[in-house]
């Protein structure tokens, strides 16, 4: 986690117009994940281009302006999170049922794998 935060700090200090981040939140707790993704959003709103590789579909649905889903190195879907992050598309891409629901209070899109408890 500390290495990821230090690397992100170096990227910000360089004031690069394009930022490429590969799984920047993978080793972070939830609070730091939100901090990093919020910071990336701030960089984008300030005019920078930010490309982030994420496997956390819920975080991508929340923070991304545009999503590109790859399967075997080929683009399987591209568009806004609302266009791309649907149960149908995600389930096809991942080969596993995925639920996409709207939060009952905030309306924010929630992406979770369908799971059944095995007793």
Residue map of PLM features:
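Catalytic Walker B motif of ABC-type/P-loop ATPase nucleotide-binding domains
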Residues: 19-23
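ABC-family nucleotide-binding domains
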Residues: 29
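Helical segment within the ABC ATPase nucleotide-binding domain
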Residues: 33-46
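H-loop/switch region of ABC-family ATPase nucleotide-binding domains
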Residues: 54-55
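A short, surface-exposed alpha-helical micro-motif characterized by mixed small hydrophobic
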Residues: 60-62
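ABC ATPase nucleotide-binding domains
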Residues: 93-119
């Amino acid at each position: 986690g500390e290495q990821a935060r230090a690397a992100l700090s170096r990227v910000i200090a360089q004031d690069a117009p394009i930022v490429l981040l590969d799984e920047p939140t993978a080793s972070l707790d939830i609070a730091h994940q939100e901090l990093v993704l919020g910071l990336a959003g701030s960089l984008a709103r300030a005019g920078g281009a930010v490309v982030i590789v994420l496997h956390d579909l819920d975080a991508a649905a929340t923070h991304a302006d545009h999503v590109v889903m790859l399967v075997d190195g080929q683009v399987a879907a591209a568009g806004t999170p609302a266009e791309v992050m649907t149960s149908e598309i995600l389930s096809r891409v991942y080969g596993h049922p995925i639920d996409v629901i709207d939060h009952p209070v905030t309306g924010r899109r929630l992406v979770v794998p369908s799971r059944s408890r095995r007793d």
